[in-house]
Amino acid sequence: LENIDSLFMAMTYNIPVQSVIFSGLRGVGKTVLINSLQKKAEEKNIFCKHIEVEERNDFISQIASCSQAFLRKISAKEKFKHLIQKPLEAIKSLVISFDPNDSTFSLSVQERELYKSSNLTQSLTDVFTTLGEAAYQSEIPICFFIDEIQYMKSAELGALIAALHRTNQLGYPIMIVGAGLPKIYAMLSEKKSYSERLFL
């Protein structure tokens, strides 16, 4: 826990850090742990959002909603409003392409075609890197707390790892604190060879 506290502290200095995944059987206190870590992060003025992945497969909807919440936070300050457009465009593309039932963005058929993407990894990477740039410039780091990661679709997990990897390469302060059943480690190692470097 001290290690994680030092990661949070590094983020407040705009230093990119590794993400953290906790695994264990049901009932061992993973959710309680990540909730307490979220409080610690919030005390350091890190922007935090909790996502509980469920079998109904709504990860894309939740990550988009959490990302928009970050943009609302920074838009409250006039000097940061110019940072919003790029991540908003990326979120729009992600939602229109991979969460078609979402009605957040009302666009014409022609506009929808402009935002349409068939590559989830690229779309989520665009969201994370543009969010990361806004986080860096506004000096408001971001931490997403994701519970029940094992319910993520394989393509979503692979896209999340790739997005985190690219964000980390660019030096942006975004991290994940996740929790899941023990099989999550096998799922991570199957997805990307560099996932072991991304997570503590």
Residue ranges and their predicted role:
Residues L1, L120-L124, K153-E156:
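Phosphate/oxyanion-binding active-site loops and adjacent basic polyanion-contact surfaces
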Residues E2-I4, D126-T130, G180-K183:
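Short acidic/polar alpha-helix capping motifs at helix-coil junctions
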Residues E2-Y13:
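Pre-Walker A adenine-sensing motif
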Residues N3, S36-K40, Q62-C66, A159, ...:
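Alpha-helical scaffold elements adjacent to nucleotide-binding pockets in ATP/GTP-utilizing enzyme cores
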Residues Y13-V28, V32-I142, Y172-I174:
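P-loop NTPase nucleotide-binding core
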Residues I140-L200:
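The catalytic "switch" region of P-loop NTPases
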